[in-house]
Amino acid sequence: MKVQRPKGTVDILPAESGSWEKVETIARNFFKRANYREIRTPSFENYEVFSRSSGESSDVVEKEMYDFNDKGGRHIALRPEGTAGVVRAYVENKLYGPDVVKPFNVYYIDNTFRYERPQAGRQREFHQIGVESFGSNSPLADVETIMMGHDLLAELGVKNYELHINTLGNAQVRKDYHDALVNYFTPLKDQLSEDSQRRLSMNPLRILDSKAEEDKQFLPDAPRIVDYLDEDSKKNFETITDMLEQLGINYVLDDDLVRGLDYYTGVIFEFMVEDKNLWESATTILGGGRYNHLVEEFDGPETPAVGFGIGEERLMLVLKEQNPALFEDEGIDFFITNIGEGTEMKAVEIARSLRKQDFKAQYDVDQKKLKQQFRKADRVHAKFVITLGAKELENGVLNIKRLADGKTLDLSLEDLNDMKSVMEKIED
């Protein structure tokens, strides 16, 4: 039997994992500067965590979620998105208590799972970078979250991205809009796709996000939520957009934007990238919004919240096209070559010392001929080669060579204890 990875999964090999690490490090440092701390939740949860949060009628729950009964008969689901598990952890660990500073701000970088048709930037196991902020209903919290998404994409080197924004209003607005959609689509029910016929009775808002050809003809004339917003919802949304304008963050008011999960309330947003080398049309790489009732769904107290998630696979496709420097092999700082009796352990000691000084250093564990060692140094993209022979060891003097231009420098074994000073001499 040929052993292969499951369909919809990808091996991120060392040639690529370095660029993933760079992106995630940039994201981690970015979030830390905003005082967001990391949270790690299980890769699988009880099924109800996701069915209650995402909505029984959502495509995620109906079609895409990996769920099963474990050996103890428990109904388990693999994490299809990041927010629900974080909310569950927030409630279960009583992070809503008065001893926890609000807003409670966290970020995560996790693998997630959905049974989808694999394609470029979309796998059945994929990765999400996300943030969640609990405890503030201020429009400034929404703006902070949107601004973070905007600025993170800029820091990563993403180009040609556009912010699309909409609001779903409050609970009463959602109810009124729900009724309007039911009234509009009910006479058309027999002409809708099978999925949308089912959604009509469960959550007609989902019909607006349908990609089925039989549904698309009815969407342009469907009611728009903007016509059902009350004054408070309008004022809140105007405050948010005014702040974005003051911050110089351009946006597109998008009445068609509804998002794919049922827990959103208030402002929702997506950052879309247009790159003809990747996709025929603009594609979402970051999406989020406000969800003020999800904590209550998990039996917690009334808690406003807002957040976003980034699909890391799509992000990496964009960055490979738009910021290729992130994908360059940085190589190592030093390769220690050695020849002659008694030099092996000294090469090990030198590499060990350099690593302790935060340099990347390697030596040849196979102890091949010197010519082969130099060839290996070139293949691993070493910046410098340190050569150690029996004579050099006896005299306590080493030779260091910069491979880029051949510049050399002799140094004593003691010099290795302060290699940063040696590097400064070479650069002069």
UniProtKB/Swiss-Prot annotation:
Q: Tell me which Gene Ontology terms the entry assigns under biological process.
A: histidyl-tRNA aminoacylation
In the Enzyme Commission scheme, what number(s) does this protein have? 6.1.1.21
Highest taxon in the source lineage: Bacteria
Query: Where does the protein principally reside?
Result: cytoplasm
The compartments listed are: Cytoplasm
**UniProt-recorded Gene Ontology molecular function terms:** ATP binding; catalytic activity, acting on a protein; histidine-tRNA ligase activity; transferase activity
Which reactions are catalysed by this chain? Answer: tRNA(His) + L-histidine + ATP = L-histidyl-tRNA(His) + AMP + diphosphate + H(+)
Per the record, its GO cellular-component terms are: cytoplasm
Keyword list (alphabetical) reads: Aminoacyl-tRNA synthetase, ATP-binding, Cytoplasm, Ligase, Nucleotide-binding, Protein biosynthesis
Q: Which Gene3D superfamilies match?
A: Anticodon-binding domain, Bira Bifunctional Protein, Domain 2
**Assigned protein family:** Belongs to the class-II aminoacyl-tRNA synthetase family.
Q: Which HAMAP family match?
A: His_tRNA_synth (MF_00127)
Self-association state and partner proteins as the record states:
Homodimer.
**Protein name in UniProt:** Histidine--tRNA ligase
* Annotated organism of origin: Lactobacillus gasseri (strain ATCC 33323 / DSM 20243 / BCRC 14619 / CIP 102991 / JCM 1131 / KCTC 3163 / NCIMB 11718 / NCTC 13722 / AM63)
